[in-house]
């Protein structure tokens, strides 16, 4: 994604100091996350050399929710409230994100997938459904490719499988600029290294320049039941790329969420939760 990063950073500087205009359409908004329910269990798991923040809610068949790049687990608050009524819901902050610490090891999706697998081991969860947004969906695809025995179903929203799946128009999109600005503020509030946001972004950006890079042949080997999901106004991922992913993964279901964008879980929380539940609970 960050072959556009320098230009996008300049755009953010021009827009962050102005109030985010009231949007005419839901898909142009960036709602604040709801309040996260009280966790049944939370803490820090020693994972791959860093401390990974996690929280667990409810009981039942497990569901792992993985957030997107530069974000944190609290974006899932609405989904946690709904899914935890019938499932054991696990959320976490990816390495370097939110409350989790990070190492100097270069970021990569294989590495981040291994972090989540280690967290599942720590929580003694052998197999889980996975709901992933953006980078979280990419991590889910990585696990489906390399460790399908750990997944029951995969709901991957706003993910890409090659770098050219990113829409270059994202660099001038106000909603996405507002997200980057909010992410910086959240990082300073939540991180154990609040003064290192620029270094963190640089590390993530380096990964985005070259990853992911999966071929159609690789995607064709995925056996996990998969839903490829997108808002009908996604700012960051090209629609044709989303459709390509759904056609390349055997048996994948394509789900398009109406009047929603890259941030569908915030814009349409109820519809998002019901779409996810309908897929992960399907027999």
Where are each of the predicted segments found?
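Active-site nucleophile elbow and catalytic-triad environment of alpha/beta-hydrolase enzymes
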Residues: 202-218
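Acidic catalytic loop of the alpha/beta-hydrolase fold
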Residues: 233-237
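Catalytic active-site module of serine/aspartate enzymes centered on a nucleophile-bearing elbow/loop
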Residues: 258-283
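Active-site loop/oxyanion-hole signature of alpha/beta-hydrolase fold enzymes
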Residues: 57, 91-131
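Flexible "cap/lid" loop of the alpha/beta hydrolase fold
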Residues: 138-146, 152-185
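Conserved HGGG/HGGXW glycine-rich cap/lid loop of the alpha/beta-hydrolase fold
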Residues: 50-99
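Short beta-strand/loop motif that positions the catalytic acidic residue
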Residues: 222, 228-230
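Alpha/beta-hydrolase fold catalytic core
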Residues: 2-6, 11-14, 21-61, 86, ...
